[in-house]
Amino acid sequence: MKMKNNIFFAALSACLILASCSSDTEEPVVVPATLDCNGIEEGTSMQDDCGDCQQAYIYDFVSHNVQLLDDTMELTLGQTEILVMPNDPTNPYWNAGCIPVPSTYTFDRMGQSTVSYGGQTARLQMAVELYGSFSSASEAELLEMYNDGTGFSDPALNSSGKKLGNKTASYHYSSLVKPMFDAMLSKQANVVMPAVNAGTIAAPGVAGEYTGAGGRSVKVDEKGFELNQTFIKGMIGALCVDQIVNGYLSPSKLDPADNDPSGLGAGEYTTMEHYWDEGVGYLYGLEADITAPTFSGNGSVLLNKYAGKVNTAGDVDMNAVYDALKAGRTAIVNMDYTERDAQGLIARELISKILGVKASDYLRGGASELGNTTPDMAEVIHDLSEGFGFVLSLQFAIDGSGNYLFTKEEVDAMLANLEAGNGLWDIDAATLNSMADDIDARFGL
């Protein structure tokens, strides 16, 4: 018992934060040397609970599993397991201290920022230029920008090594979804723009340009789809949400073995820290200052733009998303993976909700216009082309339990309804409202 007491007394000299870190800034309570900071006699408990749980545990250095302990008596270790006492520096998760959740998304090591998502900023910039090239670029030029990451006006983008195509639906249904985006680019260049340039007036079954009574002009394929809208709204889900929700913030991506800060210098980051930041970058990568995101004036055509819209409308609280992202990144620094996953799930669910809100909004917008005595078909087409892209995106959204809200088959069925017959030229309001009702029910809107 004396040896056990000595082990525990030595363990009080520092804190290993496994489950969470204390942010208590009050002066430490002076206690007798034989008691821990909760007044428990040394050696009588495996917990040294100085504010939050700091326990001895078993660590498996192959599977990286952790088993908290209340007692080490009669303990048998497996061949790949080690016993780690509180604050033992041999612990692969060793962390000499903890940090509180910052007021802004600001993290550093030795005074230099560790937040980095330059690759995400580059891809978002690529999306802006690609979207702006739909009416002027050839098929080869559009596909080069999308798949090769070259052909942009900014030499820095061309030499970045980043691409949009290889990140499209890369975590979910890539082989089935990615070709849809290639096809949109090809059809825009080979079908829509030749008809527009020839002065063809779009009509059911005829690609070209159509101007509505309100003055809006739309460049559409034979089914009435604005392919620039179906493409870019689809990329909100297939690129941004898939990368965030199903990739960088997903527990399956965040292996504790990738979060060893030992030996890191000023401004250097662990792989897990960087993964989290990369996920954040798909939302905030075009913001001038991530410490004060505005969701406006940054040229975004993807997730950030619509995050601002739903935040302004009160449909999704983006402050809650920001807080969860800060708390999750803090938990990574503190090696509190339970908290990391809890905060990650909050952010992932709320970001997913953006897709449901906008898909429903655009479908109902089209249905509302169709309900007029003389619908403005340019407005219908524009709303429903955007709606098509958001519906396509729904297969990447999750609920509060981390489960997908729609299967690919369900999404494909909705897309088929929009494409049936002459597509948007003869869709009816009842079909649109029924689809929107289903989306609302799934997301709890």
Map each language-model feature to its residues.
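Generic hydrophobic/packing signal
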Residues: 20, 36, 49-55, 272, ...
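Mature extracytoplasmic or organellar-lumen-exposed domains after removal of signal/transit peptides
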Residues: 61-445
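Sec-dependent bacterial lipoprotein signal peptides
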Residues: 1-19
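Primarily marks secretory-pathway-exposed extracellular/lumenal segments that are disulfide-
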Residues: 6, 21-74
